[in-house]
Amino acid sequence: MTAREVPAVERLAAGVELPEFFHYLGMSVVKAAADEAVVRMQVPKGLLSPYGPVHGGAIAALIDTTIGVAVACRMPHGARTATHELNINYISFSKEPVVIATARVIRLGRTVAHCESEARSEAGDLIAKALATFGIFRK
């Protein structure tokens, strides 16, 4: 079986289809399933703000990536997705070196997926909550 024949859930869990950007930011897939995606980010020093907390842009990238994994796990082979809208509410900040995001698809249509996500510190403190709309591009 080639990598393209393996279901998206398995490919994502194995890191097969993850861009270099994903690894550059210290991300790793913890869970890639039809019901939920979980991505962990070991925050590189360069992603800390001048005052110590993890930069909000790094949190946004983690949330966007985690939602992308959640949507990809629900897609038929060959379909692609792209972020249309991402609304993040930052609740708190984290100075911890690990941030974990979870995401799930709320509604999956033919061309659009509505999703939600949250990012937490490794200790479980809520950092941000997000809603997103992803476009679905089928072959």
Predicted segments, located by residue:
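Terminal targeting signals and extreme-terminal segments of soluble enzymes
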Residues: 1-139
